[in-house]
A protein has these predicted regions:
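Charged, glycine-rich intrinsically disordered N-terminal tails and low-complexity linkers that flank
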Residues: 1-36
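Generic structural marker for isolated residues within well-ordered, non-membrane alpha-helices
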Residues: 9, 42, 116
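Nucleic-acid nuclease catalytic cores
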Residues: 31, 47-76, 80-168
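Nucleic-acid endo/exonuclease domains
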Residues: 40-43, 55
């Protein structure tokens, strides 16, 4: 049970053995377009955040089981840095911004908030809020600023530990 708008039921069914993983299925067009537009979104973010630098591409972190009681891996769309400061930067495409809530708030969809919260928790980049850039219709870009929340991060860890332990029972 998770908060993903699209993947949670399929992933859960795959882990339960009800459904096989379809590795040969092509990614959806919006998913592919999202990756195609990441360099443009990175450029927008850099222009709006002078003094910060971005990694040239995705950055992956592998977290050993002993860190949180379960193994994990996380991939950031970009890692931002300014001096010794680091922050998570994530990019998304949206065909319809109405699903993203009020543009003038930082009320991003729960599954994306959970994603960047986990990214901050796993990387330790918690001193600066994560920034979630969404590129909508007509190339309208909005940045959601998501501060680290220790309570939410702990809840994510708790759920992941329970899930990881459940795999041993299967």
């Amino acid at each position: 049970n998770g908060d993903s708008q699209r993947e949670t039921p399929r992933i859960a069914a795959t882990f339960d053995g009800v459904m096989s993983v379809e590795c040969s299925a092509p990614p959806s067009e919006i998913f592919a377009l999202g990756h195609d537009f990441e360099p443009a979104m990175a450029s927008i973010w850099k222009r709006r955040n002078p003094g910060w630098q971005l990694s040239p591409g995705e950055v992956q972190y592998v977290i050993p089981e002993e860190d949180f009681g379960y193994p994990a891996a996380v991939t950031l769309d970009r890692r931002a840095r300014r001096g010794s400061s680091r922050r998570v930067v994530e990019f998304k495409m949206a065909r319809d911004l109405s699903a993203w809530g009020d543009q003038f708030t930082d009320a991003a969809p729960a599954d994306y908030v959970a994603q960047v919260m986990a990214q901050m928790a796993y990387t330790g980049f918690t001193d600066h809020p994560a920034e979630l850039v969404v590129l909508g219709p007509f190339f309208e870009a909005h940045t959601y600023v998501i501060p680290f929340d220790e309570y939410v991060a702990q809840a994510i860890h708790d759920h992941c530990r329970v899930f990881y332990a459940s795999l041993a029972d299967d």
